[in-house]
């Protein structure tokens, strides 16, 4: 598996300060995609042991909230097979940090409720290691810059542990409180 880029100290792709890994390879080809170069599975650099260790080291400070997996498409079967051991290791090293994943596939597709070409032998385990899944393809006609942590209004922020327990999609509830102050 290759990665297109890694963003350290990212604040756009999940709560808090995170390390975001943009994998290469995507078959969705959403019109208006912000990362078209990552559609190509051969784009970027190999996701080798040195890179994985660099990511693990970047997450050591207490102020790092976790990692986010983006793309490209993390749930393309080729990428899932490489990401699973990485996420397992991340969970072992940092059990109190979160793992977010952005996928053009929907919850219903990834859990096998509807047909999905991306489901493979590791899908269920990889899904079980996530805290939040931002699901659904980017839809340019539904693009909304006011949405937090997603690009179009069809996309959902799903609490994966609660969704797995309920056997149905459960929206992630943002604990962040925003307030304005006047004098």
Predicted regions: what they are:
Residues 1-22, 31, 35-42, 169-174:
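N-terminal [4Fe-4S]-dependent radical SAM core
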Residues 1-3, 17, 35-116, 121, ...:
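Conserved Radical SAM active-site core
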Residues 28:
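Glycine-centered loop/turn positions within well-structured domains
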Residues 76, 141-142:
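Short glycine-rich, flexible loops that bind phosphorylated cofactors or substrates
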Residues 86-91, 143-183:
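P-loop/Walker A phosphate-binding loop and immediately adjacent motor/lid segment at beta-alpha junctions
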Residues 125-128, 151:
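Short, conserved loop/helix-junction motifs that constitute active-site signature segments
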Residues 131:
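Receiver (REC) domain switch/active-site residues of two-component response regulators
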């Amino acid at each position: 598996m290759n990665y297109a880029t890694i963003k350290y100290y990212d604040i756009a792709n999940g709560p808090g300060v995170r390390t975001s890994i943009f994998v290469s390879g995507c078959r969705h080809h959403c019109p208006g995609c912000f990362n078209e170069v990552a559609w190509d599975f051969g784009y970027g650099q190999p996701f080798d042991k040195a890179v994985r260790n660099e990511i693990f080291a970047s997450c050591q400070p207490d102020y790092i909230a976790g990692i986010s997996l983006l793309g490209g498409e993390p749930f393309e079967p080729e990428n899932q097979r490489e990401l699973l051991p990485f996420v397992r290791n991340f969970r072992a090293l940092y059990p109190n940090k979160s793992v977010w994943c952005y996928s053009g596939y929907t919850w219903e597709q990834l859990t096998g409720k509807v047909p999905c070409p991306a489901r493979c032998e590791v899908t269920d385990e990889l899904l079980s290691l996530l805290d939040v899944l931002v699901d659904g393809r980017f839809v340019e006609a539904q693009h909304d810059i006011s949405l937090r942590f997603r690009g179009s209004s069809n996309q959902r922020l799903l609490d994966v542990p609660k969704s797995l327990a309920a056997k149905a999609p459960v929206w992630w509830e943002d604990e962040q409180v925003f307030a304005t102050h006047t004098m």
